[in-house]
Swiss-Prot record:
Cofactor remark: Binds 2 [4Fe-4S] clusters per subunit. One cluster is coordinated with 3 cysteines and an exchangeable S-adenosyl-L-methionine.
Annotated transmembrane regions: none
SMART domains in alphabetical order: Elp3
Enzyme Commission (EC) number: 2.8.1.8
GO MF assignments: 4 iron, 4 sulfur cluster binding; lipoate synthase activity; metal ion binding
InterPro entries noted in UniProt: Aldolase_TIM, Elp3/MiaA/NifB-like_rSAM, Lipoyl_synth, rSAM
Main location: cytoplasm
Amino-acid positions noted as binding [4Fe-4S] cluster 1 in the UniProt annotation, renumbered to this chain: 68, 73, 79, 308
Name of the protein described by the UniProt record: Lipoyl synthase
Length: 321
């Protein structure tokens, strides 16, 4: 029996190569079977792309990554023009193979020890007031990357003392308490971890993750830092029902999560999970009403909402759709 070829560090696997070994196999979508994208998902492009080019240049010159680009976010133009970006630390190669996500899989390189300082300097140069810091999954690291998050928060605050920092973290599988011990040295202003979908769809959409682990991570952070808001995000269109999503919202509130983002899943390529339905704006509005009734302090629900979409406005309590 031939052994699978060992991945070389730094090599990005995408599309069919990325999802070749997940438990629920992906059958590449044929154009004629793909659902037609409705009009409410049309993204209006800005009149000028100057600000977009400036932000991309700032990222390139410092060897930094944005999840906006790596995950092919549909809101990239709007957010970059708004002067916001979600920085992705610890490289652009993930140790997981989630088939909804467009971030590459592979064996990551060692963390860049200079990245926290580069990130802080870039944020200062961009004159940002609110930043979101996220990362790929780093199951290869003993702490899951928690120390690197803490280092980034510390360096950012050194150069940007008035800034607000939201972190969007992986699940720190098998090392939650150790990771939270480290993050307690430099707690963020908002702690975000995405559940992504309802638990019965985890095997298909989040191989290697566990619904209860993710809930426990959010709850345990809140127990340690009761004054720091906790936040989570979900996608719709992966085969879930509205009632399944409603139950996830109840579970989040039972685990003391206060902020919510709920948006439409969009298929990055034919090798990713197909969109099983497009959820109407009216349905998102109904789930927004439920979220408010359940006691979420902030709930952004709409087709183009993403976890860090206008995160600065949401943190200020402003309406985001």
């Amino acid at each position: 029996m031939n052994r699978p070829e060992r991945l070389q560090p730094g090599v990005k696997l995408r599309d069919a190569d990325k999802v070749s070994r997940i438990p629920v196999k992906i059958v590449p979508s044929e154009r004629e079977t793909m659902l037609r994208k409705p009009d409410w998902l049309r993204v209006k492009l800005p009149a000028s792309n100057q600000r977009i080019l400036e932000i991309k240049q700032a990222l390139r010159s410092n060897g930094l990554h944005s999840v906006c680009e790596e995950a092919s976010c549909p809101n990239l133009a709007e957010c970059f023009n708004h002067g916001t970006a979600t920085f992705m630390i610890l490289g652009a190669i993930c140790t997981r193979r989630c088939p909804f996500c467009d971030v590459a899989h592979g064996r990551p390189l060692k963390p860049d020890a200079e990245e926290p300082v580069k990130l802080a300097q870039t944020i200062r140069d961009m004159k940002l007031k609110y930043v979101v810091i996220t990362s790929v999954d780093r199951d290869d690291l003993r702490d899951g990357g928690a120390q690197h998050f803490a280092d980034c928060i510390r360096e950012i605050r050194k150069l940007n003392p008035e800034i607000k920092i939201e972190i969007l973290v992986p699940d720190f599988r098998g090392r939650i308490d150790a990771a939270l011990d480290i993050l307690s040295t430099e707690p963020p202003d908002v702690f975000n971890h995405n559940l992504e979908t309802a638990p019965m769809h985890y095997r298909k959409a989040r191989p290697g993750a566990n619904y209860q682990w993710s809930l426990d991570l959010l709850k345990r952070f809140k127990e340690r830092h009761p004054n720091v808001p906790t936040k989570s995000g979900l996608m719709m269109g992966l085969g879930e029902t509205n009632e399944e999503i409603a139950q996830v919202l109840r579970d989040l509130r039972e685990h003391k999560v206060e902020m919510l983002t709920l948006g439409q899943y969009l298929q990055p390529s034919k090798f990713h999970l197909p969109v099983e339905r497009y959820v109407s704006p009216a349905e998102f509005d109904e789930l927004k009403v439920l979220a408010d009734e359940l006691g979420f302090t902030h709930a952004a629900c709409g087709p183009l909402v993403r976890s860090s979409y206008h995160a600065d406005l949401q943190a200020q309590g402003k309406e985001v759709k």
